Amino acid sequence: MAVFARMVKGQVRHYSAPVDMAIPASKRKFIPSSGSYPKGFLVSGTHVGVKASNTKFPDLALISSETPCSAAAVFTTNKFQAAPVQVSRDILKTRQGHGIRSVVINSGCANAVTGKGGLEDAVAMGKKVDECNGLNEPSTLVMSTGVIGQRLPISKILNNIPAAHTNLSSTHDAWLSTARAICTTDTFPKLLSRTFTLPSSPERTYRLAGMTKGAGMIHPNMATLLGVLCTDAPVEPSALQSLLKYAVARSFNSISIDGDTSTNDTVAILANGAAGGAPVTSSAASPDYTALQDILTSFTQSLSQLVVRDGEGATKFVTVRVQNSPHYESARLIASTIARSPLVKTALYGRDANWGRILCAIGYTQGVAPGTVVPERTSVSFKPVDGSPILKLLVNGEPEQVDEERASVILQEEDLEIVVDLGGGEKGEQGLGGEEAVYWFCDFSHEYVTINGDYRT
C-alpha cells in the first residue's frame, strides 16, 4: 500500500512526453502529448521479453487502483475463448463486479488454445499481482494478446511483475508506456483521456482514461480487441456493466478491419470513486446515469476509431452510415456487411467509385427484416469530409451520372463517409422509420497481405 500512497501524490496534473520517433509520421498526430488521468490509478509498462522479436519495447502492462473498484467487462463470443478471458470472466462473476484492484496484460502471446496449463498461467499472473497488492483473494483481471496456440513464457512474466508493480506511476509517460505495452502489430499506442461532470454535482470534476490495442483480427461480436477504461467517478457495478454494454455496442462493436473476431477480445472498465460524490446507479430515471452513458459512448467511439486508423496496411478511415431504416438492427447488419466486404475495401484502396460493390453488399446482407431494403427506395452517396456537396451515386434505385474526376478527388482523401439511405434518398420518408446505424472501417491494401503473411516470421 505504501507504494500507492507515495505515487498518487500530485496525480491530478497534466503531463507531457516526447513522441516516440519509431512511430510513423502520419500516425503521430493521434498520440496525445499530455493527459488528465483519474485519481488513484497507477500504471506501468515493462519489457519482459514475451515477443519473439528482439525489441526492447514494453510487453507487460499493469493498471492498478489505490482502492477497490467497481468493475465490468465484455468479452469475445469466439467459441475458442482464451485462458485469460475465462479467468477474468470467472473473477468478475465471483466478485459480482466488486473489489477489483488491477488489470495485468501481456502482449506477444495470446495464451489461447493452451489447455489446462494456459489456465494455470493466467491464474498465476493475476495471483502474482494480488500478492504485490497485499491481497489474498482474486482481485486482478488478466488479458493477453498475440499468437494463438503457444504457451506463455510464464516464468519471465511472474519474475517481472514485482518490478512492474514497483514502477507504477501516474505520469503521462507511464500511461503512454502502458498503452504501448499492449500493442502487437499496432503502429502507435492508443490512449485517450478526458474530464467530465455529472448533473448531480456539476462543481465536481471527474476523469476518464482509456487505452486499447488492435490493428488486425478486428470485427465485433462483442468485442473486438483489448481495451481498459478507468474512471475516478463512483459507479455501482450493475450500472457500470450496463453502461459499458451500451457503449461497446455503439463503438467497439461498430468497427471492422478484416472481419475476424479474436479469441481474446476483452474491454473492461474500472471505477474507483476516488473523486467522490454519490454513486451512479442503473436507475433509468437517473440524470447521472443518462449523462454518463452519453459520455462513455462518445469516449469509446473515439477510442475504437483509433483502432481503425491503425488498421494493418490501411490508407483510409471510412464511415458507413445507413439511415432511414425501419429497424436499427437491420441498419446495423447492413453497415457491418459493407464494412467487411473485401470488394468494397479494395475498391476504396484503388480509389474506384464502384458503387455496385456497395449495393451488392446491401443486397446479400443476412438477417435483415423484410421490407427494409426496397431497391426503388435505396440511395448511395459519398460524403466528402471537407463539407462540400455529397456525390450521389445511386438515387432511389437509379444510377446517377457520376463525375469520375470528382469521385477520384474524394477517394484520395484519408477520410471518407459512405451514406446509404433506405428511405428514398433526399425525401427521407420517415414513415418507413428513421433508424440509423454507423460503422467505421478501413480499406484493404497490398501491405495487409504482407503483414499477415509474415505475422509469425
UniProtKB/Swiss-Prot annotation:
* Pathway(s) the chain acts in: Amino-acid biosynthesis; L-arginine biosynthesis; L-ornithine and N-acetyl-L-glutamate from L-glutamate and N(2)-acetyl-L-ornithine (cyclic): step 1/1; Amino-acid biosynthesis; L-arginine biosynthesis; N(2)-acetyl-L-ornithine from L-glutamate: step 1/4
The record's listing under Pfam families reads: ArgJ (PF01960)
| Catalyzed reactions per annotation | N(2)-acetyl-L-ornithine + L-glutamate = N-acetyl-L-glutamate + L-ornithine; L-glutamate + acetyl-CoA = N-acetyl-L-glutamate + CoA + H(+)
**SUPFAM superfamilies, per this entry?**
DmpA/ArgJ-like
Q: Which InterPro entries match?
A: Arg_biosynth_ArgJ (IPR002813), ArgJ-like_dom_sf (IPR016117), ArgJ_beta_C (IPR042195)
Q: What is its EC number?
A: 2.3.1.35, 2.3.1.1
Q: Where does substrate bind?
A: 184, 213, 224, 312, 452, 457
Keywords, A to Z, come to: Acyltransferase, Amino-acid biosynthesis, Arginine biosynthesis, Autocatalytic cleavage, Mitochondrion, Multifunctional enzyme, Transferase
Record's comment on post-translational modification? The alpha and beta chains are autoproteolytically processed from a single precursor protein within the mitochondrion.
The entry's localization annotation reads: Mitochondrion matrix
Q: What is its main location?
A: mitochondrion
List of catalytic residues: 224
Q: Which biological processes are named by the entry's GO terms?
A: L-arginine biosynthetic process; ornithine biosynthetic process
Q: Care to name a GO molecular-function term for this sequence? A: glutamate N-acetyltransferase activity
Marked site positions, Cleavage: 223-224
Coiled-coil ranges from the UniProt annotation: none
**PANTHER family under this entry?**
ARGININE BIOSYNTHESIS BIFUNCTIONAL PROTEIN ARGJ, ARGININE BIOSYNTHESIS BIFUNCTIONAL PROTEIN ARGJ, MITOCHONDRIAL
Subunit structure, as described in the record? Heterodimer of an alpha and a beta chain.
Write out the similarity annotation: Belongs to the ArgJ family.
Spell out the protein name for this chain. Arginine biosynthesis bifunctional protein ArgJ, mitochondrial
Q: Which organism is it from?
A: Aspergillus terreus (strain NIH 2624 / FGSC A1156)
